[in-house]
Amino acid sequence: MAKAKFERTKPHCNIGTIGHVDHGKTTLTAAITAVLAARVAGNTATDFANIDKAPEERERGITISTAHVEYETEKRHYAHVDCPGHADYVKNMITGAAQMDGAILVVAATDGVMAQTKEHILLSRQVGVPYIIVFLNKCDMVDDPELIELVEMEVTEQLEEYGFNDCPIIQGSALKALEDPNGPWGDKIMELMDTVDSYIPDPQRDTDKPFLMPVEDVFTITGRGTVATGRVERGTLHLNDELEILGVKEDVQKTVVTGIEMFRKQLDEAQAGDNIGALLRGINRDQIVRGQVLAKPGTVTCHHKFTAQVYVLTKDEGGRHTPFFNNYRPQFYFRTTDVTGVCELPAGTEMCMPGDNVEMTIELIHPVAMEQGLTFAIREGGRTVGSGRVATVIE
């Protein structure tokens, strides 16, 4: 029999499991693949052991263990991330190694909300995970429906505290579904996936977002003008489009694209992922520098001061050997450039140890084009000592 060709006919969506240790995240991940393999064409089951011994990956020098599985429902194709350890989650969410369009929060009905349940909800809010669906696991072990109701209320309250309102809750048992994918507990997994299909909207594709390109290099073509090169981060660019040049300098400059080139060929349009050179009308070589961005007018703003969720690398990951204190002044590497800034630790936090994850306020000496969720590295003398994501923009 000929091999079936992979047809990307369905919308794609990135999701993941979050929640307290031993509440059943990995079992649920395995159960989803097992139930879908039994009920929806085009799926294969991934067993618990393969997800649990997740391979280590290095993302920006940080060691993270993450398991990636894929599966599809009738409606969508999914990439699903699951992390074995709590520290892996924290790193994963802060480095943006796994961008999630939505998350399944696993809460054991036997335990209710625990420390990491809260921490993962907070992290989801900080890094901009837009949707959370709750899977109340181990319901087969709780006989009293009133107890389950109490746990549901507790989870809802916790989610609302961080601005996640009206999150759907599905009751089930991942282990039971894994044992019998076609049974009634398997139905609960299908109910979960139907909810994921309907509650998380189709993600906007990168090409549909407003154009943005970080400038990597600038040079002059004699007789033609100034060219900025870089990789298009999102959106599409057409000849004669108006653009703004922002960041690093205080003022915003306007220009028009009079030429687009890729691999020495002229293009009419460039889109997300392309490495291009853009010829900019009326801009001198010294008016634009690496680290600025080209963006569709009015879509991006520059800021000096913001709060961020930061993970500080351990000594083993090549980070600092010693803690840092308030008013620490490292470099912040955004997209293509380093900017010096000052860290203000939260009230009551005296210092930040290697391996910590902390929310801090940062003030940069130059403005940077930013929005919530933008990732950056913290560097000292060229080596990465931390990783962060913008949580809120202040000024």
Curated annotation (Swiss-Prot):
Location of region: G5: 173-175
Subcellular localization(s) per the UniProt record: Cytoplasm
Top enzyme category: hydrolase
Highest taxon of source: Bacteria
Residue numbers binding Mg(2+): 26
Substrates-to-products reaction catalysed: GTP + H2O = GDP + phosphate + H(+)
Alphabetical list of InterPro entries matching this protein: EF-Tu_GTP-bd, EF-Tu_GTPase, EFTu-like_2, EFTU_2, G_TR_CS, P-loop_NTPase, Small_GTP-bd, T_Tr_GTP-bd_dom
Chain spans, region G4: 137-140
Signal peptide: none
EC number(s) recorded for this UniProt protein: 3.6.5.3
Pfam families xref list: GTP_EFTU, GTP_EFTU_D2, GTP_EFTU_D3
Keywords from the named record: Cytoplasm, Elongation factor, GTP-binding, Hydrolase, Magnesium, Metal-binding, Nucleotide-binding, Protein biosynthesis
Binding site for GTP: 19-26, 82-86, 137-140
Cellular component GO terms, alphabetical: cytosol
Coiled-coil stretches: none
Region (G3): 82-85
SUPFAM superfamilies: EF-Tu/eEF-1alpha/eIF2-gamma C-terminal domain, P-loop containing nucleoside triphosphate hydrolases, Translation proteins
NCBIfam families from the UniProt entry: EF-Tu, PRK00049.1, PRK12735.1, PRK12736.1, small_GTP
Entry function: GTP hydrolase that promotes the GTP-dependent binding of aminoacyl-tRNA to the A-site of ribosomes during protein biosynthesis.
Subunit structure: Monomer.
Protein name (database record): Elongation factor Tu
Lineage: Bacteria, Bacillati, Bacillota, Clostridia, Lachnospirales
